[in-house]
């Protein structure tokens, strides 16, 4: 579960290393975001000489959470970290590579470009 003020790792090579969630896109007063939700975040740590800089406000989609994800078939998936991928207004990733495993639920939410770049889909 991701809420405002939560720090997340960045799972792509867009230039950001760490994000902090500011807002959850969707309803006006949504408390928590889960895998596949789009958030508004600020970059807290960035790689030097890259397009994205520190204190820049971006949109990101959550790809991994420490909180368990329960599927309809009874499988429970839990990751070691909270991670997101920086996206543009159309929902395409700003980076060209994705690091780490991502959940299959992103394919159902029409983030097919992120799924195709990922090395492993669970």
Curated annotation (Swiss-Prot):
Q: Per its UniProt record, what SUPFAM superfamilies does this chain match? A: Ribosomal protein L14
What are this entry's molecular-function GO terms? large ribosomal subunit rRNA binding; structural constituent of ribosome
Keywords of this protein's UniProt record, alphabetized?
Answer: Chloroplast, Plastid, Ribonucleoprotein, Ribosomal protein, RNA-binding, rRNA-binding
Give the protein's recorded name: Large ribosomal subunit protein uL14c
The principal localisation class reads plastid
Q: How does it assemble?
A: Part of the 50S ribosomal subunit.
Q: Which GO terms describe its biological process?
A: translation
